[in-house]
């Protein structure tokens, strides 16, 4: 299958990761997953060195950080590191928490959007809108 866009999905919850990967793959996205900041950054760097870099990243807000331990807001640290390497990479922060202040922090740090997990409707439309820009 020829994919139109390559997506990095970083989430530490296996069920959510598999479900999102399956759904997005069926819709024509190539989805590469990681379950923590270290793996996410390593995967991103490898793709950047290839001729097939990522077009967009979906990052869970609270994932194991660069210490390997679960860390609140670690997704924001990964966001910063990804933007050091690729400033124009569109990033959507995923979270289970519907809190406006977290959305503002994510966007102020360079995320294009903030999406609350569990409401799957709307994510693909959001991704399409960002990728079309």
Where are the regions that the model predicts?
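Acidic, metal-coordinating helix/loop segments flanking the phosphotransfer/catalytic sites
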Residues: 33-58, 66
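Alpha4 helix (beta4-alpha4-beta5 surface) of REC/receiver domains from two-component response regulators
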Residues: 69-73, 77, 84, 97-116
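Conserved phosphotransfer cores of two-component systems
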Residues: 46-51, 81-89, 109
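Two-component/phosphorelay signaling modules centered on CheY-like receiver
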Residues: 14-32
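Conserved acidic carboxylate
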Residues: 11
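Two-component signal transduction core modules
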Residues: 57, 91, 114-115
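Receiver (REC) domain switch/output surface
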Residues: 124-133
């Amino acid at each position: 299958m020829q994919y139109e866009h390559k997506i990095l999905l970083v989430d530490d919850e296996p069920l959510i990761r598999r479900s999102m990967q399956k759904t997005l793959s069926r819709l024509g996205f190539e989805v590469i997953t990681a379950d923590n900041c270290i793996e996410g950054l390593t995967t991103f760097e490898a793709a950047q060195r290839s001729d097939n870099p990522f077009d967009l990243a979906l990052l869970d807000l609270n994932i194991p950080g660069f210490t390997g331990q679960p860390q609140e807001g670690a997704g924001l640290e990964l966001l910063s590191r990804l933007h050091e390497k690729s400033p124009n990479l569109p990033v959507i922060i995923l979270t289970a928490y519907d809190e406006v202040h977290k959305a503002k922090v994510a966007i102020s740090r360079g995320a294009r959007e903030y999406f609350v997990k569990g409401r799957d409707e709307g994510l693909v439309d959001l991704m399409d809108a960002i990728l079309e820009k």
